[in-house]
């Protein structure tokens, strides 16, 4: 049984809630003092993990639609990608305002240059910005074949983002490793596509 247009619409509502409600929880948790002695780090890690979750969900759509023979699932991919960018932007903002502080914004450039894991994170964010800005059908028509070439850079983000996460934690825990392995699996699902690039 294939999804109907109406079912996809309801799925989009659910996914919007999945993207928005964690933000509500984040504010509530901060107000209730739920975080540890270093709430800035907690918020940074939470927002970063949310961005990674939506990135992986975005990458899951195409193989899932293909293997499950559910072509309409492709319609949720843009939504997931935009939530990935939204959470990545919150992640960057939380680092800038909570870690550096509003009075030290001038240090952001040097921090990105001098800390390799921040360099990777910024590369990911810039790519996501470009993908979000060109995600509309109008931009797809305007860019033509270049649109697909640009959006293939999401695979670079899928490689760099888990490395950024692994590099940023002081104590390696199972969580960043799991995200990295999931990214590898989702990229491996596209091995035929990657092979065609090298022919």
Curated annotation (Swiss-Prot):
UniProt keyword terms in alphabetical order: Cell inner membrane, Cell membrane, Electron transport, Flavoprotein, FMN, Heme, Iron, Membrane, Metal-binding, Transmembrane, Transmembrane helix, Transport
Membrane topology type: Multi-pass membrane protein
Q: Name one GO cellular component term.
A: plasma membrane
Cellular location of this protein?
Cell inner membrane
Quick check: keyword Metal-binding in the entry? yes
In its UniProt record, a GO molecular function of this protein is: heme binding
Q: Does the keyword NAD apply?
A: no
This chain's function reads: Part of the MsrPQ system that repairs oxidized periplasmic proteins containing methionine sulfoxide residues (Met-O), using respiratory chain electrons. Thus protects these proteins from oxidative-stress damage caused by reactive species of oxygen and chlorine generated by the host defense mechanisms. MsrPQ is essential for the maintenance of envelope integrity under bleach stress, rescuing a wide series of structurally unrelated periplasmic proteins from methionine oxidation.
* Record PANTHER family: PROTEIN-METHIONINE-SULFOXIDE REDUCTASE HEME-BINDING SUBUNIT MSRQ
**What is the recorded name of this protein?**
Protein-methionine-sulfoxide reductase heme-binding subunit MsrQ
Which gene holds the coding sequence for this protein?
msrQ
């Amino acid at each position: 049984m294939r999804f109907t247009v109406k079912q996809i619409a309801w799925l989009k509502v659910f996914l919007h809630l999945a993207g928005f409600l964690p933000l509500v929880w984040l504010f509530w948790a901060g107000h209730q003092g739920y975080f540890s002695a270093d709430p800035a780090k907690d918020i940074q890690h939470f927002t970063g993990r949310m961005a990674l979750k939506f990135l992986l969900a975005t990458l899951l759509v195409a193989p899932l639609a293909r293997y499950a023979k559910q072509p309409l699932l492709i319609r949720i991919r843009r939504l997931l990608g935009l939530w990935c960018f939204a959470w990545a932007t919150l992640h960057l903002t939380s680092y800038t305002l909570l870690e550096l502080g509003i009075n030290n914004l001038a240090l952001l450039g040097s921090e990105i240059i001098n800390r390799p894991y921040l360099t990777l994170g910024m590369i990911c964010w810039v790519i996501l910005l470009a993908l979000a800005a060109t995600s509309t059908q109008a931009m797809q028509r305007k860019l033509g074949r270049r649109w697909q070439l640009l959006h293939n850079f999401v695979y670079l983000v899928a490689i760099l983002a888990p490395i950024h996460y692994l590099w940023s934690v002081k104590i390696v825990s199972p969580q960043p490793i799991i995200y990295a392995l999931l990214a590898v699996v989702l990229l491996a699902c596209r091995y035929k596509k990657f092979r065609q690039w090298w022919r």
